[in-house]
């Protein structure tokens, strides 16, 4: 029926993301396995709410939760290191922290889409790309996509 087709499409568009205060990555992987939805890893949220969990212990499950789709991830830098502002997004991305995140993902040899969350929006993205081109040997496919 048309209603069941709509329901199926809605169900297929649901994903779960770890947050910065309550649901950590372990919680999301557990939920994902029980209701078969993909996990969006928000790395900044993981840093804020890691509960001493090693992200490497969960990446295989996060990546496989997407089945044949490209996994989605979010990356942002904290506004500053004070407890009050650590959870807030910076205007720009800290390139060294981003490179470190890519280095964490590299051993899994898996394509991912990383959404940059920064107050300066496109300007932050293009600054990050310039810094990556200067600091790394990544192979750029287009203006903002690269291979490691």
Please name every model-derived segment.
Residues 2-7:
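Short, small-residue-biased leader/transition segments that mark boundaries at the very start
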Residues 37, 48-148:
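Histidine-acidic metal/acid-base catalytic patches
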Residues 30-32, 41, 50:
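Long, repeat-rich segments with strong aromatic
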Residues 20, 45, 120:
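Short, glycine/acidic-enriched loop or turn micro-motifs at the edges of active sites
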């Amino acid at each position: 029926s048309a209603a069941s087709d709509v329901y199926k499409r809605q169900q297929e568009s649901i994903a779960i993301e770890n947050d910065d205060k309550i649901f950590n990555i372990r919680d999301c992987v557990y939920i994902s396995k029980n209701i078969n939805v993909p996990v969006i890893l928000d790395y900044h949220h993981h840093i804020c709410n890691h509960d001493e969990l090693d992200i490497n212990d969960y990446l295989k499950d996060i990546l496989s939760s997407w089945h044949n789709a490209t996994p989605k991830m979010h990356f942002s830098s904290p506004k500053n290191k004070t407890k009050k502002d650590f959870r807030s997004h910076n205007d720009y991305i800290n390139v060294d922290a981003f490179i470190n995140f890519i280095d964490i993902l590299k051993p899994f040899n898996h394509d991912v889409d990383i959404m940059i969350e920064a107050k300066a929006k496109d300007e932050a993205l293009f600054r990050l790309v310039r810094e990556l081109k200067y600091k790394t040997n990544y192979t750029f496919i287009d203006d903002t996509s690269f291979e490691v």
